[in-house]
């Protein structure tokens, strides 16, 4: 029987209502439990959380102790990757959805990248992938800079964690770490690339529509979200 795949926004918490990372993690876990229990339904449901976090560093499973910034709040998380920063001006998205009985995690990451690349094109930015490195990148002269990071986990065939798109955030916090463990490339923001301010709220609609399309889900909030 045909399966209807609907991706609905569960929560939007943008400036000035920044979402504490711990609260966002609890929301993810609640949605994960709900979606895990409904995987057998013919109508496959999925949920999306969009937010700007309060300033925080998060360390993925492969982060070593010496990679942690000194005298800063760091939260250990179960996603892939290493250490990164979240905070105001950065659009964070958590798609919580089933990947089916035989999850293809790499394909899922590539779909997220595709959605973000298409969203960047809507504001005139040419983002791209780099082989062997997750996320979305842009070219700055002779060097590559990351504009979006991706770190996911799949548990009981259902996804957790997601992506972080640098929109108008301060880049200074990244100077205290080696972002995602990549020492030979920098980070940037949409606003820095375009030389004008683009906030998470301004690009949210495009990101949601593009992610839905890339994941082949029906967007229940077509138009402005």
Curated annotation (Swiss-Prot):
Keywords associated with the record: Acyltransferase, Cytoplasm, Transferase
CDD domains found in the cross-reference section: LipB
GO MF, any single term: lipoyl(octanoyl) transferase activity
Superkingdom field: Bacteria
Domain BPL/LPL catalytic stretches: 42-219
Reactions catalysed: octanoyl-[ACP] + L-lysyl-[protein] = N(6)-octanoyl-L-lysyl-[protein] + holo-[ACP] + H(+)
E.C. code: 2.3.1.181
Record-linked Pfam families: LplA-B_cat (PF21948)
SUPFAM superfamilies: Class II aaRS and biotin synthetases (SSF55681)
Active site per the UniProt annotation: 180
Any single biological process term in GO: protein modification process
Sites where the protein binds substrate: 79-86, 149-151, 162-164
InterPro entries: aa-tRNA-synth_II/BPL/LPL, BPL_LPL_catalytic, Octanoyltransferase, Octanoyltransferase_CS
Function summary: Catalyzes the transfer of endogenously produced octanoic acid from octanoyl-acyl-carrier-protein onto the lipoyl domains of lipoate-dependent enzymes. Lipoyl-ACP can also act as a substrate although octanoyl-ACP is likely to be the physiological substrate.
Entry's family note: Belongs to the LipB family.
Note: In the reaction, the free carboxyl group of octanoic acid is attached via an amide linkage to the epsilon-amino group of a specific lysine residue of lipoyl domains of lipoate-dependent enzymes.
The protein's name in its UniProt record: Octanoyltransferase
The species this protein was found in: Tropheryma whipplei (strain TW08/27) (Whipple's bacillus)
């Amino acid at each position: 029987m045909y399966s209807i795949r609907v991706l609905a926004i569960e929560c939007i918490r943008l400036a000035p209502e920044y979402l504490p990372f711990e609260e966002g993690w609890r929301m993810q876990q609640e949605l994960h439990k709900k979606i895990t229990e409904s995987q057998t339904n013919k109508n496959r449901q999925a949920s999306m959380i969009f937010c700007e976090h309060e300033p925080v560093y998060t360390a993925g499973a492969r982060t070593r102790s010496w990679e942690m910034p000194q005298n800063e709040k760091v939260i250990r998380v179960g996603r892939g990757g290493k250490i990164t920063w979240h905070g105001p001006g950065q659009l964070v998205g958590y798609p919580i959805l089933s990947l089916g009985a035989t999850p293809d995690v790499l394909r899922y990451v590539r779909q997220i990248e595709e959605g973000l690349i298409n969203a960047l094109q809507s504001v005139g930015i040419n983002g791209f992938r780099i082989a062997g490195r997750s996320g979305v990148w842009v070219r700055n002269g002779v060097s590559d800079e990351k504009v979006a990071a991706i770190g996911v986990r799949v548990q009981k065939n259902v996804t957790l964690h997601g992506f972080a798109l640098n929109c108008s955030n301060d880049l200074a916090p990244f100077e205290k770490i080696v972002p995602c463990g990549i020492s030979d490339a920098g980070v940037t923001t949409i606003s820095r690339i375009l030389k004008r301010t683009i906030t998470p709220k301004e690009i949210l609609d495009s990101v949601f529509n593009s992610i839905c399309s890339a994941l082949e889900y029906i967007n229940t909030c077509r138009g402005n979200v």
